[in-house]
Amino acid sequence: MEPWKQCAQWLIHSKVLPPNHRVTWDSAQVFDLAQTLRDGVLLCQLLNNLRPHSINLKEINLRPQMSQFLCLKNIRTFLAACCDTFGMRKSELFEAFDLFDVRDFGKVIETLSRLSRTPIALATGIRPFPTEESINDEDIYKGLPDLIDETRVEDEEDLYDCVYGEDEGGEVYEDLMKAEEAQQPKSQENDIRSCCLAEIRQTEEKYTETLESIEKYFMAPLKRFLTAAEFDSVFINIPDLVKVHRSLMQEIHDSIVNKDDQNLYQVFINYKERLVIYGQYCSGVESAISNLDYISKTKEDVKLKLEECSKRANNGKFTLRDLLVVPMQRVLKYHLLLQELVKHTHDPMEKANLKLALDAMKDLAQYVNEVKRDNETLREIKQFQLSIENLNQPVLLFGRPQGDGEIRITTLDKHTKQERHIFLFDLAVIVCKRKGDNYEMKEIIDLQQYKIANNPTTDKENKKWSYGFYLIHTQGQNGLEFYCKTKDLKKKWLEQFEMALSNIRPDYADSNFHDFKMHTFTRVTSCRVCQMLLRGTFYQGYLCFKCGAKAHKECLGRVDNCGRVNSVEQGPFKPPEKRTNGLRRASRQVDPGLPKMQVIRNYTGTPAPGLHEGPPLHIQAGDTVELLRGDAHSVFWQGRNLASGEVGFFPSDAVKPSPCVPKPVDYSCQPWYAGPMERLQAETELINRVNSTYLVRHRTKESGEYAISIKYNNEAKHIKILTRDGFFHIAENRKFKSLMELVEYYKHHSLKEGFRTLDTTLQFPYKEPEQPAGQRGNRTGNSLLSPKVLGIAIARYDFCARDMRELSLLKGDMVKIYTKMSANGWWRGEVNGRVGWFPSTYVEEDE
């Protein structure tokens, strides 16, 4: 048996790889093992399996997504621990790039073989390898670097289950919440629904007791042993949690015991706003535990006091460290408890009301999960900051990381290619030169000033580092050209740049006269449109710098008319002052959600508005006015004439509400949508692609019209999509309610229904990477068989991806679920051929 196969068996026995992993298949190749180990995550877990706590998993990047920087950091962490903990010599180790670039995978196998023979590894009782004579054929490793370059990496999510394990603190939580079944009266009414209600009430009582016990048995006694800063860093906002839960517990008890749970749904809806303080707690709990560990190690008196407190609180069963994780567990249980109650509630009105409460608690859970997720991202950002020399600006200001890796760059007026490592964020690109394990910052590119464009002519060269695309300055300054190692990497970089630019300038950012920009909200904030919380700790959503409206990316197209013009040029939004009128009630500011108004009679300024109001707005019958201010008692309203752009006051009886306009649909996240594009540009995009590659573009000459461009018989063909009476069609005999529906239909039915000479379906969206012909249906079939479908869910809300790992959803989408990661509230699934992560609270599983 070849050494790499024996290595794979050793990894399985070490419980790092599952027994049915693809490296055990008859079709397995050494490439499969190399690709599995490349990110360093499983190697770090291997050391922890051989000796627990060899590596602190919080210090590695558990989902590096093939970021070169993060993968190399993981690999170097593994190599350092091999020396420091396992006593291996540096000469016995491979170098980080031997694995990441698989330039010497034979050396990697050799290192793992030596590791298997260290005293620590042998003490586990697992046989080292090789266990038999084998021929070490170096030739099998030679083609790996090219194969890695040519193969698009997908996540093997099931592999990481062993790394994540159970939710931290889960067992402690379950132990604390155990119902005392012996005390439960047994009666016929004690049905499943009654059990659900009893569980909600009892667990809330027990949880409140746990919080009170932390306050009474730990906080009070430790106050004189800790400094004020230490005290606050360990206990965060637990006193606030105690107050909220004492009150919540009483209201839940009152509703279930005294009111037959008729108002239970309202209790949870009312408390959602008060429970967002968990964002602060969950942001700080990891640091709290680290600080507690450090204080315990450095202060003997505190260590002894903690042991004493634990004995008084619960006979020493749970330490303070155990108990600090419980609040994070509890806040993520409310929606699960309500979900079970909804399932066993049959009265239609009660069920509908409880679903409102369930939505509120799902929103809260997603908010908390995103805070946790952002904390992981902030750790990554901190690592970037510490590893880049000459970087004086906080990387945090550049948004979330989209990717990093090696690239070659030229300015458009020079032709010398420079080897660089770039870090791409939402708002900027940090261009660096590699210096050993660190990087030297050479330039920061502000992406707000740039757009990207493909350079398809470079694809014809068909050699490494020849695949280029442009970064063009929007104000005409000198641009850049980036060159990628392979065509597939170029496609990946283009997607990542497009995602970053779509975060900076999303569709509908300026719709209805708004001026939306990415923004970090320092307070917990809800979306103007869907009323759900803006998620995370930084750059959570978008702020209109004119009227102060706040929204999710996916909701921008549905924010109603902008309430003010030029009210926020700089700095934070300030709400407009209310005007008062001595002759009538003080007018209130109209919610910007009021509809546009249609003018039904001319007004040229007579009679004039009151002196306290402002200039008249000249309008003519048929004009459309955007309402800015007014109320039912006002004779004059303020508005903007959409024809002239002028703002002023007009008689309220001169207008009537305009017909409702359907919400615009955002197709930007679809792999086939190209946005506004001319025919020639579409032909350029398709010229070097395989037949049946297609895109859907917005026709720039005819507003609101779309066209399909598809490569057929080596030529680009264009099909106009007709819209009439709210339907889309390319053939008169078949009409569709949406563009999405039309595209989905022609993925499975030939276009010859409308065009006899076009006998093809829509097969390859132009944004998706094209696989080399030799590998199409071969390598992917070997490495990435269709994952097991765990279930089907329906999207309840729109969701717009923020990076390439995420999966955009439109309300009503049918989602195949592949992975459920309860640890962070995100699931992995597929919609219309696209695979990625999405918030589990945005979908509802089919029962």
Swiss-Prot record:
Give the phenotype of cells or organisms lacking this gene.
Answer: Mutant mice exhibit increased bone density, due to diminished bone resorption, including following parathyroid hormone treatment. This phenotype is due to defective terminal osteoclast differentiation. They also show a delayed wound repair program, characterized by a deficit in macrophage emigration to the wound, a reduced myofibroblast-dependent wound contraction and a diminished neovascularization in the restoration tissue.
Cite the entry's keywords alphabetically.
Answer: Angiogenesis, Guanine-nucleotide releasing factor, Metal-binding, Phosphoprotein, Repeat, SH2 domain, SH3 domain, Zinc, Zinc-finger
The chain positions of domain DH read 192-371
Write the protein's name: Guanine nucleotide exchange factor VAV3
Query: Locate the SH2 domain: which residues?
Result: 672-766
Q: Name one GO molecular function term.
A: guanyl-nucleotide exchange factor activity
> Which tissue types show expression of this protein?
Abundantly expressed in osteoclasts and mature osteoblasts. Also expressed in bone marrow macrophages (at protein level):.
Look up the domain of life of the source. Answer: Eukaryota
Q: Which GO terms describe its biological process?
A: angiogenesis; B cell receptor signaling pathway; cell migration; cell projection assembly; DNA damage response; integrin-mediated signaling pathway; lamellipodium assembly; neutrophil chemotaxis
An annotated GO cellular component:
plasma membrane
Q: Where is the PH domain?
A: 400-502
| Record function comment | Exchange factor for GTP-binding proteins RhoA, RhoG and, to a lesser extent, Rac1. Binds physically to the nucleotide-free states of those GTPases. Plays an important role in angiogenesis. Its recruitment by phosphorylated EPHA2 is critical for EFNA1-induced RAC1 GTPase activation and vascular endothelial cell migration and assembly. May be important for integrin-mediated signaling, at least in some cell types.
Which species? Mus musculus
Domain SH3, first and last residues per copy? 592-660, 788-847
How is the protein modified post-translationally, according to the record?
Answer: Phosphorylated. Phosphorylation can be mediated by ROS1. In osteoclasts, undergoes tyrosine phosphorylation in response to CSF1.
- Classification via PANTHER family: GUANINE NUCLEOTIDE EXCHANGE FACTOR VAV3, PROTEIN VAV
Q: Where is this region: Sufficient for interaction with ROS1?
A: 560-847
Query: Source organism lineage?
Result: Eukaryota, Metazoa, Chordata, Craniata, Vertebrata
- UniProt modified residues of type Phosphotyrosine: 141
InterPro entries associated with the record:
CAMSAP-like_CH_dom, CH_dom, CH_dom_sf, DBL_dom_sf, DH_dom, GDS_CDC24_CS, PE/DAG-bd, PH-like_dom_sf
Task: List the Phorbol-ester/DAG-type ZnF regions, as residue ranges.
Answer: 513-562
Complex formation = Interacts with the PH domain of APS. Interacts with ROS1; constitutive interaction that mediates VAV3 phosphorylation. Interacts (via SH2 domains) with the phosphorylated form of EPHA2.
One family from Pfam that matches here is SH3_2
* UniProt keyword Zinc, yes or no: yes
